[in-house]
């Protein structure tokens, strides 16, 4: 969807850009596909803070998205393209010919009235989902499973796409949006095409209050806190950290790697992503 700017009537409007929502065809969601979504504000089931800078924001309902696409050989008509407050991509409402309804991620180019289908015999066209073993090398994919039948976990955000680079034995090699080359099982399912809402990356929040509407709280540097609030805090005026950078709880921070060295999925990574 294109983005539009504003005349600088106020400092907050000067840099702000918003989506025009031209692709959205329906403004009210399908009630049968909604679920309650309680605000967690970054807390776990013990009430302890586990993710900083979250809280507030507008109330939301969760849209139940079909990430498995396992309703094989039943054609579905795209009834509408809708906004989803829980993700950067838009979603498409499908009406299956047997009466079932479902939401999927809306790929770029998907139109209302178009027919999509999933299954091993599906055609190679945008919106169809099928096992990777039945997809030609070089095809752009999104909504990709990491384990057969588990549901899609890779390439789900706006504008994302992976390219199928090779198929050898039981595994296929994909080039992910990060540049990482990764192997996945050829029985894993993927959807043809690129995730829609390509202009999402060009949206400028413009002002602090708009971040608060989205449930994002301010990020305060430890160096400007008091020593009882953060290990970097304290001192007269500005001071160097004086130690290796750490989180408020003393764990390594600011560039420290957090991925487990013995992560079981390491063996499926052919080439790590490059530095930005």
UniProtKB/Swiss-Prot annotation:
SMART domains: Ribosomal_L2 (SM01383), Ribosomal_L2_C (SM01382). GO terms for cellular component: large ribosomal subunit. Pfam families: Ribosomal_L2, Ribosomal_L2_C. InterPro entries: NA-bd_OB-fold (IPR012340), Rib_uL2_dom2 (IPR014722), Ribosomal_uL2 (IPR002171), Ribosomal_uL2_bac/org-type (IPR005880), Ribosomal_uL2_C (IPR022669), Ribosomal_uL2_CS (IPR022671), Ribosomal_uL2_dom3 (IPR014726), Ribosomal_uL2_RNA-bd_dom (IPR022666). SUPFAM superfamilies: Nucleic acid-binding proteins, Translation proteins SH3-like domain. Residues 225-276 are annotated as: Disordered. Keywords: Ribonucleoprotein, Ribosomal protein, RNA-binding, rRNA-binding. The keyword 4Fe-4S does not apply. NCBIfam families: rplB_bact (TIGR01171). Belongs to the universal ribosomal protein uL2 family. This is Large ribosomal subunit protein uL2. The gene is rplB.
